[in-house]
């Protein structure tokens, strides 16, 4: 639990990990069933991040919580989520049970390739999977059209619908 000395402390008097734990305690004090975790581990060093993830997983199991876990940290997503929704510019690109499953959407593939690129052991796997330039979204087309290496004319003119690939895997792409 938290020591009572934390009651009179200000946020700037706590470490990053302590602030996260206090935030978690504040969120859980009303015994919710659903908790939004928006970048819950983004500003933490690796050791503290892992402790917070373990705490969140433990609390999820003990209190049977449901999390909406919003993050750019693909490793954290892999550890805590049992369903992943990948979005680009507010549009759903892919819904899948795990990032360990076969990835179908070009944007999800690019995200994973970029994450692998930060690991020196995986540098040979790092390939450019999207165009570098960031152009305005075509209002009638796919949000990822300008950056996708596989985009066709249909992608520019019509937004793709999210469709089943299998029971738990959905993708929004004209080419899949």
Regions found by a protein language model. Give the residues of each.
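Conserved "ABC signature" C-loop
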Residues: 1-6
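Conserved ABC ATPase signature
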Residues: 10-14, 18
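P-loop NTP-binding/switch modules centered on Walker-like glycine-rich loops
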Residues: 44, 48-123
């Amino acid at each position: 639990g938290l020591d009572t000395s934390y009651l009179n402390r200000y946020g700037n008097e706590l470490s990053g990990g302590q602030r996260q734990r206090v935030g978690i305690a504040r969120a859980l004090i009303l015994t919710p069933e659903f908790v939004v975790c928006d970048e819950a581990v983004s500003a933490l060093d690796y050791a503290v991040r892992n402790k917070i993830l373990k705490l969140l997983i433990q609390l999820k199991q003990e209190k049977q919580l449901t999390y909406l876990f919003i993050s750019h940290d693909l490793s954290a997503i892999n550890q805590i989520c049992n369903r992943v929704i990948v979005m680009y510019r507010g549009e759903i690109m892919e819904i899948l049970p795990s990032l360990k499953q076969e990835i179908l959407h070009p944007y999800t593939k690019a995200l994973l390739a970029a994450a692998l690129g930060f690991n020196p052991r995986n540098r040979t796997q790092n390939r450019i999977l999207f165009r570098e330039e960031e152009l305005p979204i075509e209002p009638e087309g796919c949000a990822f059209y300008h950056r996708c290496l596989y985009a066709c004319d249909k992608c520019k003119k019509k937004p793709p619908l999210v469709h089943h690939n299998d029971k738990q895997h959905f993708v929004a792409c004209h080419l899949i």
